Curated annotation (Swiss-Prot):
Entry keyword Glycosyltransferase: no
GO molecular function terms noted in the UniProt entry: ATP binding; ATP hydrolysis activity; ATP-dependent protein folding chaperone; unfolded protein binding
Gene: hscA
Family under the similarity heading: Belongs to the heat shock protein 70 family.
Protein name: Chaperone protein HscA
GO biological process, one term: iron-sulfur cluster assembly
Keyword ATP-binding: yes
Role noted for this protein: Chaperone involved in the maturation of iron-sulfur cluster-containing proteins. Has a low intrinsic ATPase activity which is markedly stimulated by HscB. Involved in the maturation of IscU.
Keywords from the UniProt entry: ATP-binding, Chaperone, Nucleotide-binding
Pfam families per the UniProt record, alphabetical: HSP70
Family annotation (InterPro entries): ATPase_NBD (IPR043129), Heat_shock_70_CS (IPR018181), HscA_NBD (IPR042039), HSP70_C_sf (IPR029048), HSP70_peptide-bd_sf (IPR029047), Hsp_70_fam (IPR013126), ISC_FeS_clus_asmbl_HscA (IPR010236)
Length: 616
């Protein structure tokens, strides 16, 4: 009888049988696919040798085209040519229209308020459009590798929230791809540069792509990639450079009509061409809509200077979060096509005090890092010692009594991670508990972001504090959050997976972090006050129950003293004097000490009644 061949789950059964994996950089402006061949990561070109695939899809009744062919139709058929769809991922229609009022598409809202784009091929959502781009990349990889892909790693901006990440995974499934992992784009760059250069120490990954900006501060040490801090802007990128330059050309050409989509596209194409040319030339000639003129690099720099400054402010915040100074950073990795702009490289170099690294093509570095990670995850490198640690951008926690936020997982905690915390019931015979999941850095619920609510029912009716509920937060490698609440004595539990209907607003993460610093002292005082008020309410409720049950143990004078102390506590608890509330609580405790001792004696006597000493 032949022996069964056994291999570890996820690894190749045959020692020399490589599984086919790819890394995909699903970008706002351009996308790429890469793989590892003969030990080297490389991006895969199309039949014409082009490695970039424009993230553009042109829809017709008979079908659709993706990439360069689609982009060529943008000026003639704007409404059916969808570009920069990544910016729409995980957002509501209202959010998209508020952020990007000049988009030339015909939008309709679905029943849940999410966007649908009306095209010649019918109503399409951003997930479907993204899936068509992924299909084109997967087809390129399968043809190049002569086989079907066993799995892919897809990169996403560090700022993508749960809804945006889930939308990306849904798009991949729709494209028929097995997602090994979603990987933060800056982390993919760290993998690419970490393996190529072997640097150890703190590095900054400055990623300015077409639609998003991310800054990550990482520590590389002995094959370990640890993200110390992240920051950025989910709605800032090279596209914004293009639109600023297009508006400038419009003004110079005297074009007032913004309703002509064909002219809009011509202006944008002219701006993109000029931007690329100005990376090498000091002056470029522009010919658009019958107008001819010159644009200098100096004029272009003036237009984009404020946007570049915004990226450096985010860099400063990330460095502060990481607890390092610019001079502590050994290397600065430049990622994204927009980092080819000379002003960007110049300002970044000045900020960090060193020349940025551009050894790997900034357009390809993300895909290369994703390919390396995919090769490991698919099982081709089982002996790899590389460890990858991503982080969550904002703290996760729960609402507790008094409108306070109890942080369960602090921001910048590496993922995947699971943390648990025990809570007790507040009232006697409490049989249910509302779980309110929060995100943010402030101390009070009103200053943080609500992620989800659910209820745990079936808690045994015990005295206040008698039931113990364990709440577990689990963030997986893709940054998706699951929360489970379980009553420990019975095992009854409830859980929820957090999938917000749309993403964070522009700058929300940055402003939440900034506010937590600006209002730190105020928040601490507010928390202390809220905690004292909660304790006062607990003491008063407990005292009320005790008096109802055992008032006969007190004399009239003793009862009066306790009532006076309770009334005083109730009164001061309405105010904002933390010390006064604390002293009033201590006074109630002092006045009720003898009462508590008598109740304890009475309970002991009742417990011993009818039992002999030997039985005790």
């Amino acid at each position: 009888m032949a022996l069964l061949q056994i291999s570890e789950p996820g690894l190749s059964a045959a020692p020399h049988q490589r599984r086919l994996a790819a890394g995909i950089d699903l970008g706002t402006t351009n996308s790429l696919v890469a793989t590892v061949r003969s030990g080297q990561a490389e991006t895969l070109p199309d039949h014409e040798g082009r490695h970039l695939l424009p993230s553009v899809v042109h829809y017709q009744q008979q079908g659709h085209t993706v990439g360069y062919a689609a982009r060529d139709n943008a000026a003639q058929d704007t409404a059916n040519t969808i570009s920069s769809v990544k910016r729409m991922m995980g957002r509501s229609l209202a959010d998209i229209q508020a952020r990007y009022p000049h988009l030339p598409y015909r939008f309709k809202a679905s029943v849940n308020g999410l966007p649908m784009i009306d095209t010649a091929a019918g109503l399409l959502n951003p997930v479907r459009v993204s899936a068509d781009i992924l299909k084109a990349l997967a087809a390129r990889a399968s043809e190049s590798l002569s086989g079907e892909l066993d799995g892919v790693v897809i990169t996403v901006p560090a700022y993508f929230d749960d809804a945006q990440r889930q939308g990306t995974k849904d798009a991949a499934r729709l494209a028929g791809l097995h997602v090994l992992r979603l990987l933060n784009e800056p982390t993919a760059a760290a993998i690419a540069y970490g393996l190529d250069s072997g640097k150890e120490g703190v590095i900054a990954v400055y990623d300015l792509g077409g639609g998003t900006f991310d800054i990550s501060i990482l520590r590389l040490s002995r094959g370990v990639f640890e993200v110390l801090a992240t920051g950025g802007d989910s709605a800032l990128g090279g596209d914004d450079f293009d639109h600023l330059l297009a508006d400038y050309i419009r003004e110079q050409a005297g074009i007032a009509d913004r309703s002509d989509n064909r002219v809009q596209r011509e202006l944008l194409d002219a701006a993109i061409t000029a931007k690329i040319a100005l990376s090498d030339a000091d002056t470029v000639r522009v010919n658009v809509a019958g107008w001819q003129g010159e644009i200098t690099r100096e004029q272009f720099n003036d237009l984009i200077s404020a946007l570049v400054k915004r990226t450096l402010l985010a860099c400063r915040r990330a460095l502060k979060d990481a607890g390092v100074e610019p001079q502590d950073v050994l290397e600065v990795v430049m990622v994204g096509g927009s980092t080819r702009v000379p002003l960007v490289r110049e300002r970044v170099g000045e900020f960090f005090g060193r020349t940025p690294l551009t050894a790997i093509d900034p357009d390809k570095v993300i895909a290369i890092g994703a390919a390396i990670q995919a090769d490991i995850l698919v099982g081709n490198k089982p002996d790899s010692e590389m460890l990858l640690l991503d982080v969550i951008p904002l703290s996760l926690g729960l609402e507790t009594m008094g409108g306070l936020v109890e942080k369960v997982i602090p921001r910048n905690t590496t993922i995947p991670v699971a943390r648990a915390q025990d809570f007790t019931t507040f009232k006697d015979s409490q049989t249910a508990m509302s779980i309110h999941v929060m995100q943010g850095e402030r101390e009070l619920v009103q200053d943080c972001r609500s992620l989800a609510r659910f209820a745990l029912r079936g808690i045994p009716p015990l005295p206040a504090g008698g039931a113990h509920i364990r709440v577990t937060f689990q963030v997986d490698a893709d940054g998706l959050l699951s929360v489970t609440a379980m009553e420990k004595s019975t095992g009854v539990e409830a859980s929820i997976q957090v999938k917000p209907s749309y993403g964070l607003t522009d700058g929300e993460i940055a402003s939440m972090i900034k506010d937590s610093m600006s209002f730190a002292e105020q928040d601490v005082k507010a928390r202390m006050l809220a905690e004292q008020k909660v304790e006062a309410a607990r003491v008063l409720e407990s005292l009320t129950g005790a008096l109802t049950a055992d008032a006969a143990l007190l004399s009239a004078a003793e009862r009066q003293c306790i009532d006076d102390a309770a009334a005083h506590l109730s009164a001061v608890a309405q105010g904002d004097d933390v010390d006064a509330i604390e002293q009033a609580i201590k006074n109630v405790d002092k006045q009720t000490q003898e009462f508590a001792a008598r109740r304890m004696d009475q309970s002991v006597r009742r417990a011993l009644k009818g039992h002999s000493v030997d039985e005790v």
